[in-house]
Amino acid sequence: MSQAEFEKAAEEVRHLKTKPSDEEMLFIYGHYKQATVGDINTERPGMLDFTGKAKWDAWNELKGTSKEDAMKAYINKVEELKKKYGI
């Protein structure tokens, strides 16, 4: 998987006809962050930040995943979402 394919997928996911489920969006978020930043480098958000905690958890689950593996999973998921929701 190339950086260009990853960037194309990141752009395409913004143009889906229907918004993916929260679970699908957390998958996308976690893999995007792992591919672009690497292992999580922030503290878990506070008790009342439910969205922030969910996003943090999705990214934290990928700790140790290589950039290439995260990019590949991200691209594959975007392709799946394009078939499911249209673009």
UniProtKB/Swiss-Prot annotation:
Chief subcellular location: endoplasmic reticulum
Report the source organism.
Homo sapiens (Human)
Q: Which CDD domains match?
A: ACBP
Positions of modified residues (N-acetylserine): 2
What is stated as this protein's family in its record?
Belongs to the ACBP family.
Q: What is this protein called?
A: Acyl-CoA-binding protein
In the record, which positions carry N6-(2-hydroxyisobutyryl)lysine? Answer: 55
Q: Which residues carry this modification: N6-malonyllysine?
A: 55
Q: How does it assemble?
A: Monomer.
One Pfam family matching this protein: ACBP
Q: Its function?
A: Binds medium- and long-chain acyl-CoA esters with very high affinity and may function as an intracellular carrier of acyl-CoA esters. It is also able to displace diazepam from the benzodiazepine (BZD) recognition site located on the GABA type A receptor. It is therefore possible that this protein also acts as a neuropeptide to modulate the action of the GABA receptor.
Tissue specificity, please? Answer: Isoform 1 is ubiquitous, with a moderate expression level. Isoform 2 is ubiquitous with high level in liver and adipose tissue. Isoform 3 is ubiquitous with strong expression in adipose tissue and heart.
Binding positions for an acyl-CoA per the UniProt entry: 14, 29-33, 55, 74
GO molecular function per UniProt: benzodiazepine receptor binding; fatty-acyl-CoA binding; identical protein binding; long-chain fatty acyl-CoA binding
| Gene name, Swiss-Prot/TrEMBL | DBI
What's in the keyword line of the UniProt record? Acetylation, Endoplasmic reticulum, Golgi apparatus, Hydroxylation, Lipid-binding, Phosphoprotein, Transport
- Sites where N6-succinyllysine occurs are at 8, 17, 55, 77
Subcellular location, record wording: Endoplasmic reticulum; Golgi apparatus
Query: SUPFAM superfamilies given for it?
Result: Acyl-CoA binding protein (SSF47027)
Instruction: List residues modified as Phosphotyrosine.
Output: 29
Q: Which InterPro entries match?
A: Acyl-CoA-binding_prot_CS, Acyl-CoA-binding_protein, Acyl-CoA-binding_sf, FERM/acyl-CoA-bd_prot_sf
* GO cellular component: a single term: perinuclear endoplasmic reticulum
